[in-house]
Amino acid sequence: MRKANLNDLDTVMEIVENARALLKADGSEQWQGEDGYPTRLTFQMDIEGGYCWLLMYGNEIVGTATLMTQGDAHYMHIVNGKWNRPGHPFATIHRVAISGKYRGKHFANYIMSHMITLAYDAGVRNFRIATHDKNDRVHNLVQNFGFIKRGQVYTGPTDRDLRNVYELNLD
């Protein structure tokens, strides 16, 4: 794994577009909105902020994820549930995507493990991730890592922006 730089942006977007098509084929509305989220600008800001990470296989970029250790305002107001540790600092993992060329090889497990380890080494013990109700790939991934579904959050102003949220608490 390594941090992304702006020279990686085209490859990151290829991976994201491939993942967007997979989500659509799976029947998920996630990443299908008219606003094009996540956009090239989203990833440019992630890279410039030092939040975007790349999974490497040899010299090839095979996946990407964003790790935010400052918390995220969207996760402050949970509905239909509650956080296990509501007042504690937390990290959020966003925009996990694997190249279609490497799909099915469990590379998302490496990304999740690395994101958790990075934040843990920085002192974070609580992790949150949000995903669309029909994104079974992420639901299964996070549950395999011990995340527990806690409720839902809005990532935007409409009902289409309602996401299931999961939390992992480590001691």
Where do the model's predicted regions map?
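Conserved beta-hairpin
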Residues: Y51-A65
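Conserved GNAT acetyl-CoA-binding A-motif
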Residues: M112, A119-T131
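A short beta-loop-alpha structural element at the N-terminal edge
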Residues: M1-I15
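Conserved acyl-donor/pantetheine-binding loop and adjacent beta-alpha core of acyl/acetyltransferases
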Residues: T66-R95, R103
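Conserved beta-strand-loop-alpha-helix junction that forms the acyl-donor binding cleft
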Residues: R103, I129-H139, P157
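Conserved GNAT-fold acetyl-CoA-binding loop/helix
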Residues: A21-T42
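Conserved catalytic-core motifs of GNAT/GCN5-like acyltransferases
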Residues: A130-T131, Q143-R163
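Conserved acetyl-CoA-binding loop-helix of GNAT-fold acetyltransferases
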Residues: I98, G104-T117, N140, N144
